[in-house]
Amino acid sequence: RDSHAGGHGTVDLYASIAESVNTYYYRLAMDMGIAKFDAYMRRYGFGQPTGIDLIGEIPGILPSPEWKRKRFNQPWYLGETVIAGIGQGYWVVTPLQLAQGTASLANGGRRIPLRLVQATRTGLNQAWQPMPAPPSTSIGATAAQLQDIRTGMEAAMHTRKGTGWAIALGSPYRIAGKTGTVQKISRRGSVSMDPRSLPLHLRHQALFIGYAPAENPKIAVVVVVEHGGYGASTAGPIARKMLDAYLLPKSEAVVPEKPND
């Protein structure tokens, strides 16, 4: 179910992204099946290292029936496919994986291995030698498919019903983004899910992914705030400040309004 009281009614792809409609993706995951779902998410780099030049990177977990059988010696259930559709359950992803996937959406469908080092030199008086660009791979999506997702992400930020509406207010550039909120516990009856009323370790994880300018992307950002509450009210405003710092002169940066939770 959705956290929106009364539901969202009938929605299309664009509205499902803009308004963060969980039930749309429950249905989509069931229609796809976990095998196809797993294969598509792997194209974006989930369940594997990003290739960044750092030691200790973990691949995360892209759950599947095979993975669960090896890990727990248990069968896969349809309900686990359903919650995989919104990135919950056994999923484990890193901020770097989210950044790589977001950049793939923004750049036209190429997954590029991440790196920190751009050039090296052997001494202070030696010339810098650029590091060779790592080869990119196609995620296998058509231009039309990518544009559908990009349109939905832009609607999330620049339409009144979009979960990121308040984050983008006053921005001189267009943002494409998606808020996310990961619950640590299940909703039970009338128990309040307001993170402010929960112990710290049970509060939601707040996420935001995005890129800008939407029509000609120059930067992709990811913000994850552990136990931070909601993506729209906690992670999103941080991302806006990052985008402003990168894209605007300091005098033009605008502090986003805090939305109502």
PLM regions with names:
Residues 98, 231-236, 240-243:
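Short, charged, low-complexity patches
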Residues 1-222:
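Beta-lactam-recognizing serine transpeptidase/beta-lactamase-like catalytic domain environment
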Residues 225-228:
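Ligand-site clamp/hinge motif
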